[in-house]
Curated annotation (Swiss-Prot):
InterPro entries: Ribosomal_bL35, Ribosomal_bL35-like, Ribosomal_bL35_CS, Ribosomal_bL35_sf. One of its GO terms (cellular component) is cytosolic large ribosomal subunit. This is Large ribosomal subunit protein bL35. It comes from the Bacteria. PANTHER family: 54S RIBOSOMAL PROTEIN BL35M, LARGE RIBOSOMAL SUBUNIT PROTEIN BL35M. Residues 1-27 are annotated as: Disordered. It comes from Brevibacillus brevis (strain 47 / JCM 6285 / NBRC 100599). GO terms for molecular function: structural constituent of ribosome. The gene is rpmI. Pfam families: Ribosomal_L35p. GO terms for biological process: translation. Belongs to the bacterial ribosomal protein bL35 family. The keyword Transmembrane helix does not apply.
């Protein structure tokens, strides 16, 4: 039986917290900042947690995380 492969695209985007939840960056935070308010840009700096519905599928891609 060959080894399972980690999905590298997912591995670059998610980190596992100490409690086992997955942490992710927020969307819409790479460019076009002139159109965003200061408050919106400040919220984009904070990481978010993956929702429970998505967590199981992402963990299947991150076999060894």
């Amino acid at each position: 039986m060959p080894k399972m492969k980690t999905n590298k695209a997912a591995a670059k985007r998610f980190k596992k917290t100490g409690s086992g939840q997955l942490k992710r960056d927020r969307a819409f935070g790479s460019h076009l900042f002139a159109n965003k308010s200061t408050k919106a840009k400040r919220h984009l700096r904070k990481a978010a947690l993956v929702s429970k519905g998505d967590q199981k599928r992402i963990e299947q891609m991150l076999t060894y995380l």
